[in-house]
From Swiss-Prot:
UniProt keyword Calcium, yes or no: yes
Alphabetical list of CDD domains matching this protein: EFh
Keywords: Calcium, Metal-binding, Repeat
Record-listed Ca(2+) binding positions: D21, D23, D25, R27, E32
Natural source organism: Oryza sativa subsp. japonica (Rice)
PANTHER family: EF-HAND DOMAIN-CONTAINING PROTEIN, MYOSIN LIGHT CHAIN 1, 3
The protein, known as: Probable calcium-binding protein CML9
EF-hand domain ranges (all copies): 8-43, 86-121, 122-155
One GO cellular component term noted in the UniProt record for this chain: cytoplasm
A Pfam cross-reference name: EF-hand_6
UniProt gene name: CML9
PROSITE patterns, A to Z: EF_HAND_1, EF_HAND_2
Cross-referenced SMART domains: EFh
Function: Potential calcium sensor.
GO molecular function annotation: calcium ion binding; enzyme regulator activity
Amino acid sequence: MAAKLTQEQVDECREIFDLFDSDEDGRIAAGELVTALRSLGQNVDEAEARRFLADATASGGGGGGGGDIDFAAFLSVAARKMRRGATEKELAACLDVFDDARSGVIPAEQLRQAMVSHGDRLTEEEADEMVRKADPAGEGRVEYKEFVKVLMNNK
């Protein structure tokens, strides 16, 4: 699976994996998978991570007992998630649906509601955090093209 990633992406995955491999045994706790993937800028929830992990370990890429995963399994999961990620243009087009006035601005509450009820659903807390990032002045509105840039730069 890693073959579909650029060398830069593989290097970034290695860097993140090594940060979480605190005892340097070549494995990270499966429970840290969500946090590690989010460190790569990937929006992933616990259920999705469990599915990815089950697929990776079933195909021989991980599980050494104790719920730990090796770099190959992590890279497999990261590659799968990264390939599913949307581009800036695709994200902007999705948010454009909420912009009836075609002003480039959408209500922050509408964005929050969309994040907790559609697609890869966020928790209320995660959605609140994203809205705070998107609307740092607390004006109740989000310039969605800038929000997309924030999302894409989290990688």
